[in-house]
């Protein structure tokens, strides 16, 4: 009985991780904005990048009334920072830390700061929490 329960939980965990990875890959391989500036621009492709580290995709997340958090995803680690949204639907992105202007599909932002710290996406965080909860349940089930 306990072995069957552990096998079921292991299968659920494995499926969750695989689905999460495929879902993220699907989102970041898009060639266009999946949302509009009014919908907080979930994923957009970077265009006209001149720096190798800036080539990739940007995810923008709502933080407060005029502030959005962003991660630039490339083949290595994402660049993380904060952005301030300006009025209107057309924006320009000025990466002041690098002295380079980057234009993004459908919108742009002012990059306040960037770093090489890796950030976990919300889906990855949800996957980790889900995994920990299931492992806790498995541990409790094995005790009783």
Curated annotation (Swiss-Prot):
Primary localization: membrane
Glycosylation sites: 48, 74, 90, 103, 116
Signal peptide annotation: 1-20
Location in the cell: Cell membrane
Keyword RNA-binding: no
Molecular function GO terms recorded: actin binding
Propeptide segments, given as residue ranges: 120-144
Lipidation (GPI-like-anchor amidated serine): 119
Domain of life, per lineage: Eukaryota
Post-translational modification: The GPI-like-anchor contains a phosphoceramide group, rather than a phosphatidyl group.
Recorded GO CC terms: plasma membrane; side of membrane
Sorted UniProt keywords: Actin-binding, Cell membrane, Glycoprotein, GPI-anchor, Lipoprotein, Membrane, Signal
Membrane topology (UniProt): Lipid-anchor; GPI-anchor
Task of the protein: Binds F-actin and nucleates actin assembly.
Entry similarity comment: Belongs to the ponticulin family.
Protein name: Ponticulin-like protein L
Annotated organism of origin: Dictyostelium discoideum
